[in-house]
Swiss-Prot record:
GO terms for cellular component: nucleus; U2-type precatalytic spliceosome. InterPro entries: PRP38. Transmembrane segments: none annotated. It is found in: Nucleus. This is Pre-mRNA-splicing factor 38A. Involved in pre-mRNA splicing as a component of the spliceosome. Residues 202-223 have a biased composition (Basic and acidic residues). Belongs to the PRP38 family. Residues 180-312 are annotated as: Disordered. The keyword Nucleus applies. Component of the spliceosome B complex.
Length: 312
């Protein structure tokens, strides 16, 4: 029959490879249209062409449990059991991300714990987005590294129960597996090595102590006169400007504000000052103008005598 496993197929985990998929899901796959039309008579070489046509990842969806093409091709690969080299090429394919995810799922189902860690962990560096169809038939976005993390740590992926996987630290203790080195650590090592090289270059460029002494001696010498270009940029002092009047453009003379020297204003100001100084003293209550007009008879006699003496 078309649904039987090939005769020369090896048992996987002590059982028929197709039995890794649950019976109810397996029967739904056999009854699906995609299985009957697209998966009939496929070989290991033709599976690659069908895998390149995949548009999303998923298990079963809907109320009547319809399988996705991704799950149908997974069961077909379990049935024909392609060689390990073909699966490794699936995983290493960088052009088609769904071909890579299909090979990763098949390796997780059929490979040993050492092979799973060896071939799947490098895919942690693949950050491309893939479409995933959930049980409700809706599409979600996921990254390839997330899908690989589910394969290595979860019990069920794409509605398929995954075989038990041995812990990584156990394989490291038995020296079956080397400690994992992440791509981030490699980048950090590259950055540190580049920084060390830059430090060495800077040390090589550092001048010797004799050069420092020369620089210190040079500080005592008189400074060189600035270049003509630097001279032009300097702003001239007012002395230099006064020395070179020819270069300056003749400007109109400035109008200075002269104080008015009229005798009337001068007299009025002097009178105001006297009035202020006398008003500050407590004994004087009369105004300056009243004192100037009202003179005593004694003062008038004295002034008259002085005028007569001057005439004589």
């Amino acid at each position: 029959m078309a649904n039987r496993t090939v005769k020369d197929a090896h048992s996987v985990h002590g059982t028929n490879p197709q039995y890794l998929v649950e019976k109810i899901i397996r029967t739904r796959i056999y009854e699906s249209k995609y299985w009957k039309e697209e998966c009939f008579g496929l070989t290991a070489e033709l599976v690659v062409d069908k895998a390149m046509e995949l548009k999303y990842v998923g298990g079963v969806y809907g109320g009547n449990i319809k399988p996705t093409p991704f799950l149908c091709l997974t069961l077909k690969m379990l049935q024909i059991q392609p060689e390990k080299d073909i699966i490794v090429e699936f995983i290493k394919n960088e052009d088609f991300k769904y071909v890579r995810t299909l090979g990763a799922l098949y390796m997780r189902l059929t490979g040993t714990a050492t092979d799973c860690y060896k071939y799947l962990e490098p895919l942690y560096n693949d950050y491309r987005k893939v479409k995933v169809q959930n049980r409700n038939g809706e599409f979600e976005l996921m990254h390839v590294d997330e899908f690989i993390d589910q394969l290595l740590h979860e019990e069920r992926v794409c509605d398929v129960i995954l075989p038990r996987l041995q812990k990584r630290f156990v394989l490291e203790e038995t020296e079956q597996l080397d400690p994992r080195v992440s791509a981030l650590e490699e980048d950090m090592d590259d950055v540190e090595s580049s920084e060390e090289e830059e430090d060495e270059d800077e040390k090589g460029r550092d001048p010797s102590p004799e050069h420092h002494r020369r620089n210190y001696r040079d500080l005592d010498r008189p400074r060189r006169s600035p270049s003509p270009r630097y001279r032009r940029s300097r702003s001239r002092s007012p002395r230099r400007r006064s020395r070179s009047p020819k270069r300056r453009s003749p400007s109109p003379p400035r109008r200075e504000r002269h104080r008015s020297k009229s005798p009337r204003r001068h007299r009025s100001r002097s009178r105001e000052r006297r009035h202020r100084s006398k008003s500050k003293s407590p004994g004087h209550h009369r105004s300056h103008r009243h004192r100037s007009h009202s003179k005593s008879p004694e003062r008038s006699k004295k002034s008259h005598k002085k005028s007569r003496r001057g005439n004589e």
